[in-house]
């Protein structure tokens, strides 16, 4: 089990206008997948722009433990020499994923199709998160799981299938992690593995599988869903990957620029995959000035330059269908809603309850302690925006990086400073968040 980092408290104070050009870290979802698929490929994969946060570094270490050669060649430049589909070696030690649910669940899928046994573990936060909905389909494929805690929680032992079988699996919720775990396990199975989802989730795994040479076909399923069919036992080939800037990380300086008067900030190379841009669409509905140019792409993932200027925001209603495209951004959207005029209602946020913390309750608590009127009704979050935030509160982050960053953003325009009890976990996804924001003009102390 990972040892907890020493707490790093921080205070956020009202700042002057934010300006300049920032390049936020590489996308976390793409970084995990590039390492894993590089390890499952034959030959060399060159990755540029890899996120070097703790979550991704733990995935890199897991790939080494499973037999791939993973090397760093300078800032954000990495190579992976893979072992091929089904070629993972028996790890000599526990695979420790720290705080990373994404890395842990995706690697479970990749291991499930290999005739090896691996022990999975993480920190206290990850040990509290449910794994059963990932494990159920992996057991259908042929894996065997032994877990010491109820609900399949970590630590657990996963014995991969000696003869994995293809499945047709309908996901119980819109979850890219469930879908990806099934597809990664299905790589080693003969025949076609099919995943059916009622609501489309992030499609990074499908796009990257194609980039590495897999035969995968996606068709529409109903009104909002998709059917993904993967032909198993391909020979994947190493490929170059340019990791775009993470839209979930870009959300924090973006919202900061919207709420701090006079701000004019440019964010470069931000991924705009349509299944990741729900926040941008919502903020534009609220009146945000967000412009795009310099459109380009790599490995099927589009990226753009964003120019964001301070804006007067208004309350809106966010439909539940938008949740899969912005599930990690609701915390900082709630901050924007607090600075808006009028009521913002965010519907269908049940998935926030099973993240690094119960993010629904934690978001409401973050706002309340800083003088914002907020209500939870079932799985809906209702924020009464008054155009300003009183501030002055101490935010408990519950070891959650996104709560910490959202609270720090909130304090940049509040009447009184906002204190955060611990910012150490920001390193899991955005190691340079504080210096990068200070470079743009933020006041943290």
From Swiss-Prot:
GO terms for biological process: amino acid biosynthetic process; aromatic amino acid family biosynthetic process; chorismate biosynthetic process. Pathway: Metabolic intermediate biosynthesis; chorismate biosynthesis; chorismate from D-erythrose 4-phosphate and phosphoenolpyruvate: step 6/7. It is an enzyme of class 2 (transferase). InterPro entries: Enolpyruvate_Tfrase_dom, Enolpyruvate_Tfrase_sf, EPSP_synthase, EPSP_synthase_CS, RNA3'P_cycl/enolpyr_Trfase_a/b. PANTHER family: AROM/DEHYDROQUINATE SYNTHASE, PENTAFUNCTIONAL AROM POLYPEPTIDE. Monomer. Belongs to the EPSP synthase family. Catalyzes the transfer of the enolpyruvyl moiety of phosphoenolpyruvate (PEP) to the 5-hydroxyl of shikimate-3-phosphate (S3P) to produce enolpyruvyl shikimate-3-phosphate and inorganic phosphate. This is 3-phosphoshikimate 1-carboxyvinyltransferase. It comes from Bradyrhizobium sp. (strain BTAi1 / ATCC BAA-1182).
